[in-house]
């Protein structure tokens, strides 16, 4: 079991009692930990994939992540990670395409070698730019956070704008999943946020009959519609 999210120590102990090997470090990206554990079995393209993952997880400044980033030109790695992120997010309900991306990366291809990735990233960027105006118009603020219901895009794509444009230390974006009777909730915290949002969201979501959690400044939840 390899993870970098906040886990209750009793869960780790229970896994170890079951003879599960646990690799768990909240200070490094999960993919970086996978690479570090199995690098002797991986090809020389693997550190590039791990570097992109660290950037996407805002963890390229950590000890292992920063060492990997030094291998590559920083701007090359940043644009590659960004393009891959937009392609993954834009196809998140298309497992065949996601599998195709995995296979292309496994064949040691860079994002610019994979057909149409930059064009698709441009489409995603255009969609995000449209969200900015909608957030400015539709978000609401409380004393310590900004929040907004998202109607026509993903909550995770809008939540950083909600936090930033509200001027608050926490942003919350939520979108109804009509087919499932739930709300998907994304939460982000600024660098000034002093509380561990992942733990708070885990407690709140589970107490409301949902589930959730994550990092101190980036997390998410699923909440039953009547409890939103």
Task: Identify the residue ranges that each predicted region occupies.
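Accessory alpha-helical/coil subdomains and C-terminal extensions
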Residues: 62-135
